[in-house]
Amino acid sequence: MTESKFHAKYDKIQAEFKTNGTEYAKMTTKSSSGSKTSTSASKSSKSTGSSNASKSSTNAHGSNSSTSSTSSSSSKSGKGNSGTSTTETITTPLLIDYKKFTPYKDAYQMSNNNFNLSINYGSGLLGYWAGILAIAIFANMIKKMFPSLTNNLSGSISNLFRKHLFLPATFRKKKAQEFSIGVYGFFDGLIPTRLETIIVVIFVVLTGLFSALHIHHVKDNPQYATKNAELGHLIADRTGILGTFLIPLLILFGGRNNFLQWLTGWDFATFIMYHRWISRVDVLLIIVHAITFSVSDKATGKYKNRMKRDFMIWGTVSTICGGFILFQAMLFFRRKCYEVFFLIHIVLVVFFVVGGYYHLESQGYGDFMWAAIAVWAFDRVVRLGRIFFFGARKATVSIKGDDTLKIEVPKPKYWKSVAGGHAFIHFLKPTLFLQSHPFTFTTTESNDKIVLYAKIKNGITSNIAKYLSPLPGNTATIRVLVEGPYGEPSSAGRNCKNVVFVAGGNGIPGIYSECVDLAKKSKNQSIKLIWIIRHWKSLSWFTEELEYLKKTNVQSTIYVTQPQDCSGLECFEHDVSFEKKSDEKDSVESSQYSLISNIKQGLSHVEFIEGRPDISTQVEQEVKQADGAIGFVTCGHPAMVDELRFAVTQNLNVSKHRVEYHEQLQTWA
């Protein structure tokens, strides 16, 4: 009989004999021959009347002797049957010491209930995320199937929720920008949107509650010598099971080929943000699990022997790796050298998962790790498949405008660039082939190649730039592997009659490709492109794309925030001709201004404005002028992106039409 059935039967018998003023229980004993002798409280006590019960209750010794004699008879019967197992039901109730029995009953109930509740609460955490995903999937389907319905959500109530819940940063403006806590940026971090923060906070609170609910000390618990040993064991079981439930989920959210991206409409950056928070909570649960189990085992004297067992050694390996992941994944390290972080991260995750499997398999929870491994393996197989079918191609890689890499890769006929999308590039160089970097596509007139751009920063882009710098034209042919395409255009083009694309610096390629793609498909929409750059030289690496805008109905404006800085304009000289005047006192300065003038003439379809734009005023004007729903799509410097988000939230009620905001900035590092 299982413990749960035992307790259920016990409670039933107790209820039957409450009227007699005594407390009985069903007990199982073994005869000397090894056969089971079952004794039970007789239901016939009700028919025999209260006199029998009162005799039993008033003479405890009599009850015991009666039981003893019956047991002896049963034992003899067993011998008489040549050792065959016989069972005899004793109808005389047994009087037990209920005060001594209660701690055993309560202790085993607490232990069993803790396991059951841990599984229920772990399922509850998964159910919470399933609910969030279900809502996101439903909302995404409605947007795609009924775009006009979305446009009708522009009333005061809808705008109230969007202004204070759905669109804004958690604290005033900063979302793409990191929050600096000082100490040389070591504790800097990113805080998501207000809605995302609420989702994360609820998850953290639920996890904290589920880790402690229905755990309490059982007085005189016979299982543990001390209260610390008892509570430590209960908390360790609870947090360990909760942490195990979350592992497949955090692996799923961290994959590039997460099918949920297409169902929910969330971008990779959103899933990565949730991946990080679930991982942080999960590792903290595992650390609490390890600490509380150690406290319990030391209190009971089992620590040294238990730590010699294989499953505990592997559990220790997994916990240590989880702790290093938690520390090493801080924004400070990701920003300093993302490629190094990523390689170390993968190695630590492998040991975390393998160690977790060998720790959990003997405890009956190994299937959770198999689920995590299956999710991870699926992502890797798809990624390798994308790379294999694209093939190793010779790419032309060059430095443009001193701070930008341009990569041109011949592509297979089946491969189509996604407007606003990106691909991961593996450079087949001895020190670089294990690393990959996301590059954003841009639209070109040629259909036989992919053109991608990336700002030169630390890590792989810096290494490529150093390799190209001494070469003629800062250009070389490098064999590459391409993994992609990833991403998709925003829904602004589907939902809005007016679309304003705002790019800052190197955020232009994806914004440009989405803008041009929309212009090719639409004839009745108002499409504007605003590009904010610091220097004139930034135009040099994007001249061809800007010239192509002549063929579209896109209204283009370029802001040059530091127009007085004319350095680096020599890169234009092979494209734009001008006549030098040797009789001028300052021929260099004259040449620069002449060149700028010629650039403007060559791009006469583009409006050039010198100075920094007032984004708030710009947004207000665009919203007031819109004759229908208007959407702002942006990518660029985090400060600019945050400023635009804030301006949109402040102007939702300026027009009777719907105002949307779409952020294409992918913050992975």
Curated annotation (Swiss-Prot):
Membrane association type: Multi-pass membrane protein
Q: Where are the transmembrane segments?
A: 122-142, 198-218, 234-254, 281-301, 313-333, 340-360, 499-519
Q: Name one GO cellular component term.
A: plasma membrane
| Keywords noted in UniProt | Electron transport, FAD, Flavoprotein, Glycoprotein, Ion transport, Iron, Iron transport, Membrane, NAD, Oxidoreductase, Transmembrane, Transmembrane helix, Transport
- Binding positions for FAD per the UniProt entry: H437, P438, F439, T440, F441, T442
Q: Which protein family is named in the record? A: Belongs to the ferric reductase (FRE) family.
Can you say what this protein is called? Probable ferric reductase transmembrane component
